[in-house]
């Protein structure tokens, strides 16, 4: 009896131990041969002899399709914290990141403001926000941030709970939540990554990510799905707070301010629209079944968690609601993202909280707080927002909601239209650089301005300086690649673009430019990079045209595809409303090769009728006559 029982125990032990030993052996072998990628949020890198924590470019592969990675604003956190350092980490999604221009987000303003309030400290504010993530992702980020020796975590989170990873409105994940969580856990190991790669199908098939259009799944206010979302959010937020406390960090939770007054329901049907008409804006937001904004219950949970854990609360939602009606300028660009004034308000609320916690009286504002925000930057922000507001989910809003058309007069007014205006913008950038010479963000914005106006010679020394200041930023390598692409040194241009892609695999501009540079010498690689760029940013006209050109006239016949070239050229024309001469030339050429003159004539005739601009009309008419 005893020996039989002992034998059974041995068999059970072997049954349990064998797979574990096998897994450890496989995992060890894969790591030994450098298969797969680390799953942590940060990696350790050395630049100029100093060790830093930098973003892991593969971190979000557990939460998003591999072809559409998400990345934070590039950062490099010194492993050795300054003795007099005041280190702040900002955690959250796109609103926390400062989208659409993180260089003017509240993290940047917070750093300037804190530097003015604590002149005796070495102030560091690191923006760890990532577009499209939610608390399921931030929970893992927070766990990894425990080693970063921060004094404060600012957690601004809650807009993407329904649409982000594991959310019920996420089309790729909502019906498979538990399976995806298991997959997510497996992907933290190299063995799990190997299994995923082996089981993946159509890995090279282009994926068209459309942004917010992908998440138009109505979720009702009283639905079981939303109740689960709120329960998950509470659990994740408590986990984030626990990670912060374990690291000895002061965690500052903020409620989430959203646009209530000028963002009508995104799905304007039934009770939501009735509440909007009755000017009960908060209720209209809660009843809006397209859940792209944090609702009132989400903010209640944030307040409750802060209270239960004895944390200091930044009640941004209430402060915005109080101040917005009297604000001298808009606080929101769209449904949740801030204007410069909105970002400034959030930053000031955080500073107010930190000063209160440290029992310090506020000092007068710094004399040089500038971030170098110019007319050129404002124009660029409005152009981005016009593009976004022209697409779902904003298309169904009532006429008094957000509107792309309303931005057009401002965009036209801000467009640099004279030498004097350009010189004034240039001077403002140079003054900002002089005030903050070690700031890579200002310098990169200035480089963007110079390259936009084809001033590559003037841009090159600033590109070199930006590379010295922030070699971990893919934008610095992309800018240098762009400058060198127009010179006699395409090899070095390609090297910088490849460096940018290593740092951030989702840097679509580098993929697009590299694809264009490789079209003659290595068309197969060119095709791969152009498809990668298009998967990440399907509306990029330059990529559409480059890919159409390659498919139309590749020096290898097997890479030619006239049907696809026609489709790509047509997309480029449609995106530019048939006003881009290069797109029209390529469209006409693709028409001839694909024998689709009748279809093209109809498209051009429609465009002629739609435009009121005489020059555009003449250009379209000439294209039509030359078919």
Regions found by a protein language model. Give the residues of each.
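Conserved structural position within tetratricopeptide repeats
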Residues: 286, 433-434, 467-468, 498-502, ...
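Helix-start (N-cap) detector for alpha-helical repeat units in TPR-like alpha-solenoids
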Residues: 440-441, 474-475, 508-509, 541-542, ...
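Membrane/wall-proximal cationic-aromatic binding patches
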Residues: 36-118, 323
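Histidine-centered active-site loop/cap adjacent to the catalytic His
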Residues: 14, 228-233, 331-362
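Serine-dependent acyl-ester chemistry module
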Residues: 104, 158-304, 308, 316-329, ...
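Short coil turns that delineate tetratricopeptide repeat
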Residues: 150, 289, 437, 471, ...
